Amino acid sequence: MTLLALGINHKTAPVSLRERVTFSPESIDQALASLLQQPLVQGGVVLSTCNRTELYLSVEQQENLHEQLIAWLCNYHKLSPDEVKKSLYWHHGNDAVSHLMRVASGLDSLVLGEPQILGQVKKAFAESQREQSLSGELERLFQKTFSVAKRVRTETEIGASAVSVAFAACTLARQIFESLSELNVLLVGAGETIELVARHLREHQVKHMIIANRTRERAQALATEVGAEVITLPEIDARLADADIIISSTASPLPIIGKGMVERALKSRRNQPMLFVDIAVPRDIEPEVGKLSNAYLYSVDDLQAIIQHNMAQRQAAAVQAESIVQQESMNFMTWLRAQGAVETIRDYRSQAEQVRSEMTAKALAAIEQGANVEQVVNELAHKLTNRLIHAPTKSLQQAASDGDMERLQLLRDSLGLDQH
């Protein structure tokens, strides 16, 4: 048995191929059942996200193993092997162990250190548990991986700094204002970036959130989720003075918030400061706003500088995280090799016990039939000795015949012949 990881990800395949190899949540149970029907597969976990599709398997190692698994993957997704082969990567044994630990810790992610992948790995593991498709080795590996990912999070700073535009915008707001709990926030737009910003702000318990969008319908679902008020874009002028922080990200070709609008808001607020974060391209807020007193305007380029600085910090933390993964993967492989020894010892003891049981039964039967007890005992001892030393004797003879002195010495050591 060996552990194997294979897959494709954002580094090896374009989205046009990744989307054809993905497993939908509804199909995971069928995929696992089909996978475990393959003769060489003893257990499996299927991890499928927008950036990667990976199989983690415990398998019987054979020469045509890769070909069999490629054939299964291609048949399942109705692809030709030529479409997939060049994008597939393979990791065996310790490499498979360290790869999974790196993935779960965010070290192999498109955004270094992102935390979402750990939840996705846990979900994939839970699916395999539910479908009873885990081998003992895989179950132990994933449990170990979760503890390693937690250790990486707690012992390094890999997740401490913002490396997404949405997170950076919220980080900037928290740097300028000590607490967000007494502040009102206006979000302009209702796209993916604003969704992420809104969720971050909800976690920091802002006083009140307003979402302004071209249509109310698009913004209403997000507003319901985060407890926000919804207004339309034309209403911004009347409500701008209510906001301490304005974060904007729309696809508008022209600015939505102009200098005059901000001047009126500042006058209404009696010049209480306002933070503007414009993460739209083209810009949603006129650059001249940044020249007004008590109006602090940051563009997407300003956020990129924050992100680049934070990414450098994450890169430094990643070095420490890689060291943790290397250490823990070696620890796991030590345990795995020990399990192989346990199984061998169990088989050896079972074989010896079977010989003892068979020969004892014959000896007792002979005594019951009136045979001389001393003779039966001597014969039992003689036959038992011959049976137990037969296989080791053949191995010793073969090693000597082959001139394999290293193996011969190994056999002597295992039989305790050089012990005093």
Swiss-Prot record:
Q: Which UniProt keywords apply?
A: NADP, Oxidoreductase, Porphyrin biosynthesis
Which molecular function GO terms apply here? glutamyl-tRNA reductase activity; NADP binding
Where along the chain is NADP(+) bound? 189-194
Please list the GO biological process terms of this entry.
protoporphyrinogen IX biosynthetic process from glutamate
**What EC class does the entry list?**
oxidoreductase
Record-linked InterPro entries:
4pyrrol_synth_GluRdtase, 4pyrrol_synth_GluRdtase_dimer, 4pyrrol_synth_GluRdtase_N, GluRdtase_CS, GluRdtase_dimer_dom_sf, GluRdtase_N_sf, NAD(P)-bd_dom_sf, Shikm_DH/Glu-tRNA_Rdtase
Q: In which pathway does it act?
A: Porphyrin-containing compound metabolism; protoporphyrin-IX biosynthesis; 5-aminolevulinate from L-glutamyl-tRNA(Glu): step 1/2
* Catalytic activity annotation: (S)-4-amino-5-oxopentanoate + tRNA(Glu) + NADP(+) = L-glutamyl-tRNA(Glu) + NADPH + H(+)
- Which one Pfam family would you cite for this protein? Shikimate_DH
The catalytic site is made up of: 50 (nucleophile)
The UniProt entry, under SUPFAM superfamilies, shows: Glutamyl tRNA-reductase catalytic, N-terminal domain (SSF69742), Glutamyl tRNA-reductase dimerization domain (SSF69075), NAD(P)-binding Rossmann-fold domains (SSF51735)
Report the EC code(s) recorded for this entry: 1.2.1.70
**Mind telling me which residues the site (Important for activity) is annotated on?**
99
Oxidoreductase among the record's keywords? yes
Binding of substrate, residues: 49-52, 109, 114-116, 120
The protein's superkingdom reads Bacteria
HAMAP family listed in its UniProt record: Glu_tRNA_reductase
Q: Family per UniProt?
A: Belongs to the glutamyl-tRNA reductase family.
Domain text: Possesses an unusual extended V-shaped dimeric structure with each monomer consisting of three distinct domains arranged along a curved 'spinal' alpha-helix. The N-terminal catalytic domain specifically recognizes the glutamate moiety of the substrate. The second domain is the NADPH-binding domain, and the third C-terminal domain is responsible for dimerization.
Subunit comment for this entry? Homodimer.
Q: What does this protein do?
A: Catalyzes the NADPH-dependent reduction of glutamyl-tRNA(Glu) to glutamate 1-semialdehyde (GSA).
Additional detail: During catalysis, the active site Cys acts as a nucleophile attacking the alpha-carbonyl group of tRNA-bound glutamate with the formation of a thioester intermediate between enzyme and glutamate, and the concomitant release of tRNA(Glu). The thioester intermediate is finally reduced by direct hydride transfer from NADPH, to form the product GSA.
- Stated name of the protein: Glutamyl-tRNA reductase
